[in-house]
């Protein structure tokens, strides 16, 4: 898809790359499938960069407005189903 990722210009280049990598995992969930542990590892790194719940909600909202992909729903599905390894919207 062609859209911009929600980024904070105060982040380092590495942090921006890591946040984009997390959102790429969300895209994979909707477009193909994603490994749950891999997604949670990326989410953990995302939370190191964005520890504020309010900022997380704002970034998730911005991403959903641009992509129609609900990051919160995906993270909750993976968290609530630790026995599964592969996740997909299909």
Curated annotation (Swiss-Prot):
Superkingdom assignment: Bacteria
Pfam families: UPF0223 (PF05256)
InterPro entries in UniProt: BH2638-like_sf (IPR023324), UPF0223 (IPR007920)
Gene3D superfamilies assigned: BH2638-like (1.10.220.80)
Cysteines engaged in disulfide bonds, as pairs: none
UniProt similarity note: Belongs to the UPF0223 family.
Protein name per the record: UPF0223 protein SH1855
């Amino acid at each position: 898809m062609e859209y911009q990722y929600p980024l904070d210009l105060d982040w380092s280049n590495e942090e921006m790359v890591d946040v984009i990598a997390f959102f790429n995992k969300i895209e994979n969930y909707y477009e193909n499938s994603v490994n749950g542990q891999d997604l949670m590892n990326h989410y953990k790194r995302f939370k190191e960069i964005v520890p504020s719940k309010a900022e997380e909600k704002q970034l998730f909202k911005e991403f959903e407005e641009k992509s129609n992909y609900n990051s919160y729903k995906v993270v909750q599905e993976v968290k609530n189903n630790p026995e599964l390894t592969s996740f997909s919207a299909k």
